[in-house]
């Protein structure tokens, strides 16, 4: 009898891409994917460990599976991805519901782990490699419009606060040819957009082909035909003029760059081991904006890192005002055991102070985003329709070239269509408009 498996994905776009790889591996073994955990013989959680609240969310979900296990005798539960790689066999003590665990480099081992689990044998596969990229596996895509292509895995940067080098291992890249082959398959299958992924995508290297990320992006843009091309995430110290010039010159490469800064204080950037100063970051921003007028810039910000003073916090606010990011992902610092910060620094900013500083960051960014989005009112945006709006089937939701979320009246258009939309109003996170009439403009 065919076993049914449900995979729930937490966290980043790389985890979503990994779930597509895992789905491909398991369907090749004869498993049937189901959406609902209540219908499954096997429940798998693909997990994120980047922040404490992400781990808490996963542990809470594991607690909720205890009731499902009572209702479905023989149910097998697996936890995969960054959380088990981070906590290792301690996961079995954290939750008695877990039957097996596997880290991000061990997904080829899943069929064996699962077979053993159905026989009552617990298992763990947690080896990190310097070679695994899964580049030979055709993902089982979850959508038909946009696709993720992981081009490299891991990170060598060792930022003081970050668990990624411990959960994802050292950097390694796919071959240029394997990436281009996947791009051409997507183009042939009618996909409209692709996103090149990496924990630090700018560090992509294929030494045999003599390719860095700028060359890869250029070659992908040529192979992609009319598909839009995006990429994430970039590290400020690695973004190059060559890369920015590709963004400027290639029409199908979207004018949106995510460039995490974390803090506006050079002192804090040094404590964080970020590898650049405030001035160097601002110089990169100036270089990008000079080459790509109208580019959308987004970032990550941490409030209350170890030793952060009020002056450091004010430096972050002033950098936000100077750069004027289109949007930002904002969090207060939480200690991640095993990181440099946990081992060598003191988490000395009180929780209430972290929350206050974070709220000031959020409030400032909300105002900036509201002004930037408001400036788009009256413009015409070329929008790739992705889905029906959650509020009404008469509306479609999509994204502009600059990664703005745009909601508009659908008329005769369908998801996957590229639509010219006249923007009539905005919020701090969304543009609202109507389809441009034929002959208008």
Curated annotation (Swiss-Prot):
Name of a matching Pfam family: Radical_SAM
Residues at which [4Fe-4S] cluster 2 binds: 155, 159, 162
SMART domains associated with the record: Elp3
Keywords associated with the record: 4Fe-4S, Cytoplasm, Iron, Iron-sulfur, Metal-binding, S-adenosyl-L-methionine, Transferase, tRNA processing
Top-rank EC class of the record's enzyme: transferase
Cofactor binding note: Binds 2 [4Fe-4S] clusters. One cluster is coordinated with 3 cysteines and an exchangeable S-adenosyl-L-methionine.
Domain of life: Bacteria
Cofactor field: [4Fe-4S] cluster
EC annotation from Swiss-Prot or TrEMBL: 2.8.4.3
Binding site for [4Fe-4S] cluster 1: 12, 48, 82
CDD domains in the record: Radical_SAM
Domain MTTase N-terminal: 3-119
Compartment(s) of residence: Cytoplasm
Cellular component GO terms held in the UniProt record: cytosol
InterPro entries: Elp3/MiaA/NifB-like_rSAM, Methylthiotransferase, Methylthiotransferase_CS, Methylthiotransferase_N, Methylthiotransferase_N_sf, MiaB_methiolase, rSAM, rSAM_horseshoe
Catalytic activity: N(6)-dimethylallyladenosine(37) in tRNA + (sulfur carrier)-SH + AH2 + 2 S-adenosyl-L-methionine = 2-methylsulfanyl-N(6)-dimethylallyladenosine(37) in tRNA + (sulfur carrier)-H + 5'-deoxyadenosine + L-methionine + A + S-adenosyl-L-homocysteine + 2 H(+)
Similarity comment text for this entry: Belongs to the methylthiotransferase family. MiaB subfamily.
UniProt cross-references to PANTHER family, sorted A to Z: CDK5 REGULATORY SUBUNIT-ASSOCIATED PROTEIN 1 (PTHR43020), MITOCHONDRIAL TRNA METHYLTHIOTRANSFERASE CDK5RAP1 (PTHR43020:SF2)
Subunit structure comment from the entry: Monomer.
Functional note: Catalyzes the methylthiolation of N6-(dimethylallyl)adenosine (i(6)A), leading to the formation of 2-methylthio-N6-(dimethylallyl)adenosine (ms(2)i(6)A) at position 37 in tRNAs that read codons beginning with uridine.
Protein name as annotated: tRNA-2-methylthio-N(6)-dimethylallyladenosine synthase
Organism: Prosthecochloris aestuarii (strain DSM 271 / SK 413)
């Amino acid at each position: 009898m065919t076993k049914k498996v449900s995979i729930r994905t937490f966290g980043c776009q790389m985890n979503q891409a990994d779930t597509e790889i895992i789905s491909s591996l398991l369907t090749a073994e004869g498993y049937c994917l189901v959406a609902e955990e209540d219908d499954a013989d096997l429940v798998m959680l693909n997990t994120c460990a980047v922040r404490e609240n992400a781990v808490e969310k996963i542990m809470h979900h594991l607690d909720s599976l205890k009731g499902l296990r009572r209702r479905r005798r023989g149910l097998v539960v697996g936890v995969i991805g960054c959380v088990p790689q981070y906590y290792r066999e301690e996961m079995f003590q954290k939750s008695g519901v877990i039957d097996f665990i596997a880290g991000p480099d061990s997904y080829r081992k899943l069929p064996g782990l699962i077979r053993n689990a159905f026989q009552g044998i617990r298992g763990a596969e947690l080896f990190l490699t310097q070679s695994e990229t899964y580049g030979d596996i055709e993902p089982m895509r979850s959508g038909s419009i946009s696709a993720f292509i992981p081009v490299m895995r891991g990170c060598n940067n060792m930022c003081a606060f970050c668990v990624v080098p411990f959960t994802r291992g050292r950097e390694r890249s796919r071959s240029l040819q394997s990436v281009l082959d996947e791009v051409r398959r997507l183009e042939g299958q009618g996909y409209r957009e692709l996103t090149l992924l990496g924990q630090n995508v700018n560090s992509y290297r294929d030494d045999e082909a003599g390719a860095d990320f700028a060359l890869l992006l250029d070659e992908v843009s040529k192979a992609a035909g009319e598909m839009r091309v995006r990429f994430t995430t970039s590290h400020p110290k690695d973004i190059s003029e060559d890369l920015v010039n590709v963004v400027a010159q290639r029409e199908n490469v979207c004018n949106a760059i995510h460039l995490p800064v974390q803090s506006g204080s050079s002192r804090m950037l040094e404590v964080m081991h970020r590898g650049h100063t405030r001035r160097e970051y601002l110089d990169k921003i100036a270089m990008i904006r000079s080459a790509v007028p109208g580019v959308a810039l987004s970032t990550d910000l941490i409030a209350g890192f170890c030793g952060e003073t009020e002056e450091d916090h004010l430096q972050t606010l002033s950098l936000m005002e100077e750069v004027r990011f289109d949007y930002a992902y904002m969090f207060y610092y939480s200690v991640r055991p095993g990181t440099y910060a946990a081992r060598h620094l003191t988490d000395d900013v009180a929780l209430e102070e972290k929350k206050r500083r974070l709220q000031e960051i959020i409030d400032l960014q909300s105002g900036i985003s509201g002004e930037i989005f408001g400036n788009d009112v009256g413009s015409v945006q070329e929008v790739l329709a992705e889905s029906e709006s959650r509020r009404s089937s008469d509306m479609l939701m999509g994204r502009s070239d600059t990664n703005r979320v745009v909601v508009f009246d659908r008329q005769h258009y369908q998801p996957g269509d590229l639509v010219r939309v006249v923007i009539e109003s905005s919020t701090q996170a969304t543009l609202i408009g109507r389809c441009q009439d034929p002959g208008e403009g």
